[in-house]
């Protein structure tokens, strides 16, 4: 079929449009007869050899089904041609409402859909963003090494009062108005004093207690405590201290370096490795922060309307990601799949992601950006480095077009951001390492 139909376009406001398509009766009959003959050649009908039943017999048995198939085929072909004819950039899945298809009569259907917005990119010239620079001092490095020593500490039981940074084993029971409450008690509970795992006053109240000692603590739950039954309530915790254990830190020497995988170079090699890891962590975070600042400027300079259908599809995608995360955390994939999630909390994020996708695609198109092979290779190698056989993983990526295209999309986005950065002014701002860590943890 080519052009044997009538179509009209109606703009409904915003990005919404409507196509009305009418296929003439003679085209309906022509398509029906063609389909009927095709079915008759292969139909297996009782008392007839395959393909030997007359079209009249086939029509009697399958006429209604054939007519429905013809309707679907006519929609598929005529809609595609109408979209080309009107030069439409359809976004998302169209909503099709069709009249009943009948032989000898015109076949009419209506298509409601959205189109992609027309984008005229505004340059970011004149905009300014801050790029955070982080200097890691020897003091920062020493603190990190001390933290590593604490991670590898051996805990030794001691016979003295408990103090901050000790690990204690306790029994406790919490009561409200003299009555125990749910999840308010435990036996042989392990706790590091100063970890702030418990509500304010709990860990502090254990400090100074001796092994075998019991004590009652009067503690009020915070007003914003997650459990409404406990928020703002005054409770009594009866605590018995079973054990006090103090950390015995390993010596910072070559043997400790070997425990952390340093086979050559000893303590100096360990310091260099730790510094490199610290630099990588802050660099990755600050680069991402810079990228988001650039993208925020892109959205500010280029306000666009986005198709609602794409937002809804992106909400579906975000919810699917949430379910996958829950499945990994709980190890209950079947329950995670059935989770019913509200859509509104995802709408703002989904809208922003769709806007960025459309705007970045336009940046790539306007500046004729193509994925740089060297950057692509570097990205693939970065992913492969976390596997046991990196070379095998690299070969697999380059033999799998779909997986490689996903990394290619990331590279294109990075190149688009680099293009945008070249248009604006970047001011460097130095911050201490500790401040950078706080930002990462937020």
From Swiss-Prot:
EC annotation from Swiss-Prot or TrEMBL: 5.2.1.8
Species assigned in the record: Coxiella burnetii (strain CbuG_Q212) (Coxiella burnetii (strain Q212))
InterPro entries: PPIase_dom_sf (IPR046357), PPIase_FKBP_dom (IPR001179), Trig_fac (IPR005215), Trigger_fac_C (IPR008880), Trigger_fac_C_sf (IPR037041), Trigger_fac_ribosome-bd_bac (IPR008881), Trigger_fac_ribosome-bd_sf (IPR036611), Trigger_fact/SurA_dom_sf (IPR027304)
Keyword Nucleotidyltransferase on entry: no
Main location class: cytoplasm
Gene behind the chain: tig
Pfam families, per database record: FKBP_C, Trigger_C, Trigger_N
This protein's name: Trigger factor
Transmembrane regions: none
Its job: Involved in protein export. Acts as a chaperone by maintaining the newly synthesized protein in an open conformation. Functions as a peptidyl-prolyl cis-trans isomerase.
Domain notes: Consists of 3 domains; the N-terminus binds the ribosome, the middle domain has PPIase activity, while the C-terminus has intrinsic chaperone activity on its own.
């Amino acid at each position: 079929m080519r052009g044997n139909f009538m179509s009209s376009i109606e703009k409904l406001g915003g990005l919404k449009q409507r196509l009305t398509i009418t296929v003439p009766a003679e085209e309906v009959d022509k398509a029906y007869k063609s389909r009927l003959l095709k079915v008759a050649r292969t139909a297996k009908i009782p008392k007839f050899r395959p393909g030997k039943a007359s079209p009249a017999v086939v029509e009697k048995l399958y006429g209604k089904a054939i007519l429905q198939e013809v309707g679907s085929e006519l929609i598929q072909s005529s809609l595609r041609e109408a979209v080309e004819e009107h030069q439409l950039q359809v976004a998302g899945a169209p909503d099709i409402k069709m009249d009943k298809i009948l032989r000898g009569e015109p076949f009419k259907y209506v298509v409601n859909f959205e189109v992609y917005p027309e984008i005229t990119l505004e340059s970011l010239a004149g905009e300014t963003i801050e790029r955070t620079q982080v200097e890691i001092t020897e003091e920062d490095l020493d603190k990190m090494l001390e933290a590593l020593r604490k991670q590898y500490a051996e805990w030794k039981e001691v016979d003295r009062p408990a103090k901050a940074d000790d690990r204690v084993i306790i029994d406790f029971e919490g009561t409200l108005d003299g009555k125990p409450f749910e999840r308010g008690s435990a036996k042989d509970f392990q706790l590091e004093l100063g970890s702030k795992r418990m509500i304010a006053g709990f860990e502090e109240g254990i400090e100074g207690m001796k092994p075998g000692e019991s004590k009652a603590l009067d503690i009020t739950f915070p007003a914003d405590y997650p459990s409404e039954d406990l928020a703002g309530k005054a409770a009594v915790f009866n605590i018995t201290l079973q054990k006090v254990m103090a950390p015995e830190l390993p010596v910072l020497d070559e043997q400790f370096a070997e425990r952390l995988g340093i086979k050559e170079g000893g303590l100096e090699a360990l310091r260099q490795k730790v510094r490199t890891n610290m630099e990588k962590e802050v660099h990755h975070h600050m680069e991402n922060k810079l990228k988001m600042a650039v993208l925020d400027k892109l959205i500010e300079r280029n306000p666009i309307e986005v198709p609602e259908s794409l937002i809804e599809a992106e909400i579906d995608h975000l919810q699917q990601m949430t379910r996958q995360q829950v499945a990994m955390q709980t190890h209950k994939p079947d329950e995670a799949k059935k989770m019913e999630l509200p859509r509104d909390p995802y709408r703002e994020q989904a809208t922003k992601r769709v806007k960025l996708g459309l705007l970045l695609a336009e940046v790539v198109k306007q500046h004729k950006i193509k994925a740089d092979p060297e950057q692509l290779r570097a990205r693939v190698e970065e992913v492969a480095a976390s596997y046991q056989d990196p070379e095998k993983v690299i070969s697999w990526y380059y033999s799998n077009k779909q997986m490689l295209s996903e990394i290619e999309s990331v590279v294109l986005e990075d190149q688009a951001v680099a293009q945008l950065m070249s248009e604006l002014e970047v001011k460097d701002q130095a911050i201490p390492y500790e401040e950078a860590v706080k930002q990462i943890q937020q």
